[in-house]
């Protein structure tokens, strides 16, 4: 990895790059294309696994909290991979999400358009229903994992509006007068994540198993160990120093705190530059090399460089 001439764009060279073949040898960071791919490398803590197994056993949703980048979403994909029941049915909560968005969609516009064109009678309303995440999970021939991701983004009533549906695993469709329910043995396993410290309604919390993912050095070490081939050439002491710098950065008041994935990319860049780093990691945080890999906010970078706001 260290034979790659990192400084390809170089003003001091004074002329265009002569050896274009090096462009074909760029050691790209291998970003996975999906959460499912990342699940193979996800490293859960023991307490997280206990919480997952508890929620599965008692049939209650697992509510996972934690700061961004701690692996809340990945926990659901890891569980699905580990249980051999992929893919995860993923519902991404939005600021305008309603409980019904998780259940089904009725195409009212198309229904009334078709009804207007009919000379007699009315269209079959069941033809205008679209199954959404919970309905799909309930109809699966095997128990599935349903992920309700970032529930804190939803309107305040969203959690309470799902109390019956998540508790009984059934819901009513007034348009067709249908009661949809899951077979007891096929009850979906529900994972719910939240980034916010805003407290969810008490009735909702009472129906959940709860786990908070605390970002810590042990879990980061395990994540690095899983990918150790990517960091060939870096000594254990160097990696430990990099981790210390990373955690020192995370302790600062930042607009966007760097995550595990950003640390792993940063470590890969450091591995490419081993032996030629212009800066030392044991210096002040303002001198961290390649800080743009870790921080993605201009003001954060400026504050770190100035030592301000800390």
Which positions does each model-derived feature cover?
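C-terminal regulatory/interaction module of P-loop NTP-utilizing enzymes
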Residues: 1-310
């Amino acid at each position: 990895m260290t034979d790659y001439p990192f400084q390809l764009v170089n003003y001091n060279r004074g002329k265009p790059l002569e050896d274009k073949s090096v462009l074909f040898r760029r050691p790209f960071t291998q970003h996975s294309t999906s959460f499912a791919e990342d699940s193979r490398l996800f490293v859960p803590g023991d307490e997280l696994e206990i919480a997952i197994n508890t929620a599965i056993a008692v049939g209650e949703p697992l509510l996972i909290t934690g700061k961004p980048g701690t692996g809340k979403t990945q926990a659901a994909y890891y569980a699905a991979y580990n249980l051999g029941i992929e893919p995860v049915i993923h519902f991404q909560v939005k600021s305008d999400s309603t409980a019904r968005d998780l259940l089904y969609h009725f195409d009212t516009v198309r229904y009334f358009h078709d009804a207007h064109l009919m000379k007699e009678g009315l269209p079959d309303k069941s033809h205008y229903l679209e199954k959404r995440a919970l309905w799909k999970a309930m109809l699966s021939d095997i128990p599935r994992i349903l992920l309700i991701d970032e529930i804190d983004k939803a309107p305040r009533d969203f959690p309470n509006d799902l109390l019956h549906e998540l508790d009984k695993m059934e819901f009513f469709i007034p348009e067709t007068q249908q009661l949809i329910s899951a077979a007891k043995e096929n009850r979906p396993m529900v994972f719910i994540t939240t980034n916010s410290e805003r407290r969810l309604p008490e009735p909702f919390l009472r129906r959940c198993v709860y786990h908070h993912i605390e970002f810590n050095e042990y879990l980061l070490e395990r994540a690095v160990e899983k990918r150790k081939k990517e960091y060939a050439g870096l000594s254990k002491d160097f990696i430990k120093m990099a981790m210390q710098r990373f955690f020192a950065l995370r302790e600062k008041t930042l607009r966007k705190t760097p995550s595990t994935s950003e640390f792993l990319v940063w470590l890969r860049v450091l591995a490419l530059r081993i032996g030629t780093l212009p800066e030392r990691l044991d210096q002040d945080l303002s001198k961290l090399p390649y800080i743009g890999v870790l921080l993605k906010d201009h003001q954060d970078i400026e504050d770190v460089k100035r030592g301000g706001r800390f």
